C-alpha cells in the first residue's frame, strides 16, 4: 500500500514522502491517526496544495522545541536517593523521577522525551541525560545523584581522581 506521509515518522520517512507500507499498518494506524493519506491522484493533489501549510507547522514545532532546548541548557538536576556503602542505589532513578524533578524546578518535560539508552540510573554520580524534544532537537542535562544520608564520599573520591588525572596530563 502506498501512502503520503503528513509528518515525519521514525524509520519510515519525512513529510511529503510517498512510501510503501503493509496495508494493515497504513489502514489501521497511520491513516486513522492522521499521519498519512492513501497515495491516490486526488490525495496527492490535495497534499501538494497543503504542503506549505504542513511545512510551516513543522517549522513552528521545531522553533518551540528549540526554545525549550535553550531553556534546558546548563540545567543541573540534583536528586537524592538511598544508597549502599559502595554507591549503589536501593532502587533506581528512571525517566519518571527525572521528569518529576524537572517539573518541580519549573521546566515542563514529558517522561517520554527523556532518553536513557543504558536503562535506569543505579549508581551515585553524575550523568548526562538526553531529552529529545523533537526529532531534530535534543537537549542534554546533567543529573547528579547524591546519597540521601549525606554520605557522598564515592562521588567526592571520583571527582578527586578526575582532578588528579587532569593535573598528571599537563
Curated annotation (Swiss-Prot):
**Parts forming coiled coils:** none
Q: Which Pfam families match?
A: Ribosomal_L9_C, Ribosomal_L9_N
Q: Which GO terms describe its cellular component?
A: ribonucleoprotein complex; ribosome
- Keyword Phosphoprotein part of the UniProt annotation: no
Q: Which GO terms describe its molecular function?
A: rRNA binding; structural constituent of ribosome
Q: Which family does it belong to?
A: Belongs to the bacterial ribosomal protein bL9 family.
Q: Output this protein's name.
A: Large ribosomal subunit protein bL9
Source organism per entry reads Psychrobacter cryohalolentis (strain ATCC BAA-1226 / DSM 17306 / VKM B-2378 / K5)
Please name the gene that encodes this protein: rplI
Amino acid at each position: 500500500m502506498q501512502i503520503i506521509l503528513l509528518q515525519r515518522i521514525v524509520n519510515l520517512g519525512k513529510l511529503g514522502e510517498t512510501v510503501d507500507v503493509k496495508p494493515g499498518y497504513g489502514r489501521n494506524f497511520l491513516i486513522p491517526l492522521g499521519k498519512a493519506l492513501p497515495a491516490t491522484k486526488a490525495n496527492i493533489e490535495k497534499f501538494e496544495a497543503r504542503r506549505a501549510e504542513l511545512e510551516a507547522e513543522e517549522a513552528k514545532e521545531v522553533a518551540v522545541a528549540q526554545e525549550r532546548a535553550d531553556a534546558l541548557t546548563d540545567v543541573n538536576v540534583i536528586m537524592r536517593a538511598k544508597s549502599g556503602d559502595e554507591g549503589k542505589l536501593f532502587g533506581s532513578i528512571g525517566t519518571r523521577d527525572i521528569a518529576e524533578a524537572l517539573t518541580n524546578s519549573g521546566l515542563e518535560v514529558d517522561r517520554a522525551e527523556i532518553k536513557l539508552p543504558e536503562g535506569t540510573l543505579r549508581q551515585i554520580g553524575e550523568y548526562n541525560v538526553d531529552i529529545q524534544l523533537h526529532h531534530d532537537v535534543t537537549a542534554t542535562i546533567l543529573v547528579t545523584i547524591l546519597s540521601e544520608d549525606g554520605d557522598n564520599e564515592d562521588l567526592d573520591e571520583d571527582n578527586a581522581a578526575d582532578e588528579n588525572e587532569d593535573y598528571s596530563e599537563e
